[in-house]
Design a protein with these regions (language model features):
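Active-site acidic carboxylates
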Residues: 1-120
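Glycine-centered short loops/turns at secondary-structure junctions
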Residues: 70-73, 148, 174
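Internal catalytic-core helix/loop-beta-alpha segment
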Residues: 107-156
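A short glycine-rich beta-strand->turn/loop micro-motif centered on a GG-aromatic cluster
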Residues: 153-156, 174-185
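Short glycine/serine/threonine-rich phosphate/pyrophosphate-binding segments
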Residues: 159-166
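Short conserved active-site loop signatures built around small residues
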Residues: 170
Length: 185
């Protein structure tokens, strides 16, 4: 562990600039997983749960999604949404209970809807999820196996939260993983 006054971005920049560092690679059949790019987390002018993404994040995500479609690769959009009762949120929603609480992102609500700045296509796959990782209790693993995917490119909102959880689960399942820094918050 390094103890310093450097920011995480500074440490990351130093790591990327390390001479002789082995280049990370993707496999032969990637899928794109876009995590929680929904209004509850992308519209700070509307929702206190939202945050600002990287400059140009949506244009980068849209360009990447278009490129993946041209390759006939799966383009997946996950979003958080819960039952009207909020019971399916479990411990994840037990921290607090107010209008902005996690369990109050309801299916079909404006908070659950994908941000309108995203360019989706009819061939894209939408996954509702209830926990941080897109893999948790969804059929994502089956879909990736069926489509023959060996790697995933992950974009999204909270890099330290749901993006990270999805990345850890993907790597734990043996996928090569890439997180484009231009495509995350």
């Amino acid at each position: 562990m390094e103890v310093s006054g450097k920011t995480a971005r500074q440490l990351f920049a130093e790591l990327r600039a390390t001479p002789g560092r082995a280049r990370y690679r993707l496999g032969k059949r990637p899928a794109l997983i876009n995590v929680d790019l929904q209004n509850a987390y992308t519209r700070p002018e509307e929702f206190c749960t939202a945050y600002d993404g990287a400059p140009g994040q949506f244009s980068h995500v849209n360009a990447l999604a278009a490129a993946m479609r041209r390759l006939n690769a799966p383009v997946i959009w996950s979003y958080v949404a819960f039952w009207e009762s909020g019971e399916d949120c479990g411990v994840f929603g037990s921290k607090d209970d107010n209008a902005d609480s996690q369990q109050n992102v309801k299916h079909g609500s404006r908070r659950a809807a994908l941000d309108e700045r995203l360019e989706t296509a009819p061939s894209d796959i939408l996954f509702p999820k209830r926990m941080p990782s897109v893999f948790h209790e969804t059929n994502l693993q089956s879909l990736l196996t069926w489509r023959g995917c060996d790697s995933v490119i992950v974009t999204g909102g909270s890099t330290s939260g749901c993006v990270r959880a999805t990345v850890v689960d993907a790597m734990s399942r043996g996928y090569f993983v890439c997180v484009p820094i231009e495509c995350v918050a």
